[in-house]
Amino acid sequence: RSGHLGLWKALRSPHVDFFVSPYTYAFRGVGGDGLPMQPTESLRVHGKLYLFEEDTLMHNNFDPGGRMHPVEKSIPIYQRHFAQVATHGLGITWLENNIYAESPLIVDESRRWHRRFQELGEWALRLDRTPAAEVAVFLDDESFRYESFRNNIDIPLIWHQRVLSLNRFGAPHDLYLLNDLLEGRLPEY
């Protein structure tokens, strides 16, 4: 729901190199954002790679009319997600397989953009990848133990602030686990 129970332990493991998750399920459509589920800057300071699973295709296939938006609007969604991963130093996986194939309406344009994303991604790897956020925001991966199963306070105080407000408050931000601050792992802000 709002915590990442046990993430701190996994980040400290020498046996884990990367994490994969889809982007948040809220605000997936046009006008939304591509917010990763994990506190990606914590992964970075621990030397782990975050792979952003771009699964718009799968969700649009659940509802032929497009669960989040018309299929024709998928390209701007893909562009938004590429911008998210390129500006935050993340990896990305594009979900397309024999079960979930790209719509015939946009298949040629989609393939053209995926090639362009690959070119831009390879170029971006040569750039300075130092985060340039102005604000650090902290999550406590153990806070879930103290939350209720009711949505009376957890949703407005945790989920809404993180998912609704952070990407719209006007300053670039990095998202960390609280333990990163307590252990002195953060850059200067």
Model-inferred region functions:
Residues 7-12:
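Short, well-structured alpha-helical segments in soluble
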Residues 13-189:
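Carbohydrate-binding surfaces of carbohydrate-active enzymes
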